[in-house]
């Protein structure tokens, strides 16, 4: 993706705060909307915290917890709007806070589609790229062919933010 890919992947929160994380779409109120650097399902995004050291939602003060959850909903609406325009097979948006692999607060915002193979539909989307079932191998990495998607997502996030301001 970029020559600094290793750097941003090793500290996604720090690089977002420093303005050097290339996956950041927009700064939200309690975090950063980022496009997934692996696009196992088109439009996959993540909300990452803007609080260094916050490993889970309960690490934040209650008012920041609510802002993070509101930001997650904003990003979810933006992903839903963009993906529905781009693919009539959009079925739903999954919103998940897991954090079992990456030790920083983040929420997965994953579009789910009617065209997903039946053996995958009931699985958490994160398993798609681990198993290779969607592509028969490595999932598509974020690159220049995603520039238009990035632009659309950023514009829609702006619209969603304006609607709640």
Task: Please annotate each region the language model reported.
Residues 1-165:
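HIT superfamily nucleotide-processing domains
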């Amino acid at each position: 993706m970029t020559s600094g890919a290793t750097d941003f992947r090793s500290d996604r929160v720090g690089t977002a705060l420093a303005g050097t994380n290339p996956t950041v779409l927009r700064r939200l109120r309690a975090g950063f909307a980022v496009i997934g650097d692996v696009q196992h399902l088109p439009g996959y995004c993540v909300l990452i915290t803007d609080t260094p050291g916050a490993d889970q939602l309960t690490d934040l003060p209650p008012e920041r917890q609510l802002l993070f959850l509101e930001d997650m909903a904003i990003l979810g609406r933006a992903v839903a709007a963009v993906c529905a325009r781009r693919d009539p097979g959009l079925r739903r948006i999954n919103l998940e806070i897991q954090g079992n692999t990456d030790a920083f607060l983040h929420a997965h915002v994953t579009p789910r589609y009617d065209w997903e193979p039946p053996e995958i539909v009931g699985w958490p989307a994160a398993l798609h790229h681990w198993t290779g079932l969607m592509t028969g191998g490595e999932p598509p990495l974020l690159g220049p062919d995603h520039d238009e998607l990035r632009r659309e997502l950023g514009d829609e996030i702006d619209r969603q933010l304006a609607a709640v301001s």
